[in-house]
Amino acid sequence: MVERDDYAAIRDRIIGLSHTHGLRCDWAETTKRQRFLLLWDAEGRVAARAIVPLYPGETPHLVDSLERGLAHLFGDDWLEDP
């Protein structure tokens, strides 16, 4: 299982799954506490938008929201290791 309170582990999981699904990640610093993520498909369309908390241990509700928000691309339990 990916550590739900570890930003780097969550980020790496998103990047790995994105490559597997043929998506490109664009990251932007929204605030000092979170990153905005855009996932682009091969045709250049935005497949998903998400907020990724930099300190997920402090904001577990944002991790839950992130997991739900990307489930349509990666599956319901995408934060679980394969």
Regions from the language model: what does each represent?
Residues 1-29, 38-82:
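Basic nucleic-acid-binding interfaces
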